[in-house]
């Protein structure tokens, strides 16, 4: 997090300004004194020209009179001259000159100039970047009670810039600034209480400091408060409060708040679902470069308006920022030639970008492509590696495919025990192919003791999800009473489902089962199947 921005408002003159008539009188008096070389009068006259108080505003004349006062060593004027040089007011923007005048005022102990000089050193503007010098000048201003400098000192200790990282010292300076009501320091102090860095974790205290900052209009604090209300984290879950705080931050251009408002309207969380409102917030956030918002706009154009050309524009913006979900979606568009000519190599390029960042679907899809040689040379070892990466994220299809490759005698690492372990992990997540594979293993006693009851259970889990071969095997077991009770009606039901799915041999088994059934039972089960189908 960078230091807080430099001060930009000129210091006030000591002249009284109450009405236009008095301004004119002041002007005449000050002008006479200024022309005689009175530095304070020159400074006050510069202030009047800067603000257009009683006279026509003129940055050029403000610069002139500030310059005369500054040349006489008046620190207020030196500071204001530095501000005008830094902002390019009445003169071409010149950080070198700004640093020169800040230095003059800072060496006289002027805290605001010390702060701004520290900021220029921190940013390397007009001076060589020097964290040590930034630290020095922030320290001098902070010791005079300047809250912004105290906050920036805290940040330098926080990040180890110019000093060894020291969370305790960071908190010390944040607290000094926070107790003066400095919103950014209040927020930073809240973050430390939230994370328990340099202080005993106290999330209630964290929330209290964040609220103080939020109520002063500090957008990151408003966003954090909204998150707490949205998720019921520390604060009671309250969608209305969450939306209110997101709106306050979003109104200040806080991109993550704009994005979260888009999500809320997109999903109808605490408000009626409103896709147009969601899009409006996504557009605001995306316009500020928010990658997730750009990705969601891409999804809208792809799946809503089916404008693949616009979709790829937004995906590309997010993908260029390294957003893995957008990289994956861009790969899909290249693969299928949607919104652009199909290009297998570009698809693989973007899949790999996403996969390298841990995008589980991209890892799985790369595994498939290396297994089957789609867009890349076939390489079962690489296929296994990508499946393994996705499997480690508990992605059940990858766990299953990892098992399949370990099961292959011609695979890169044949290991039937490892295959069985992979199937178990996938099956526990409800993956029907893995459940069927475990059913077969228990049915045949492969790597596990033969156990028809266990086979029955695994087949049943897969069959209920529509796995046709599991339906066939379960039907055969029910017809023979193997692993479970002999039940011809259940056998007929499962075999009928297998027949409907076109499983070889199922129709013959169904006829054989029907031949063993009583006519009344056969009528009843056929009526049951008709009712299900109808």
Describe the function of each predicted region.
Residues 44-51, 80-87, 116-123, 152-159, ...:
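Hydrophobic face of amphipathic alpha-helices that form TPR/SEL1-like repeat modules
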Residues 2-4, 504-534:
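Terminal, low-structured helical/coil segments at or just beyond the last alpha-helical repeat
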Residues 439, 475, 486-488, 494-495:
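Predominantly extracellular beta-rich ligand-binding scaffolds that present long acidic/polar faces
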Residues 2-51:
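N-terminal segments that cap or nucleate solenoid repeat domains
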Residues 22, 35-38, 51-53, 58, ...:
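Short helix-capping/linker turns of helical repeat alpha-solenoids
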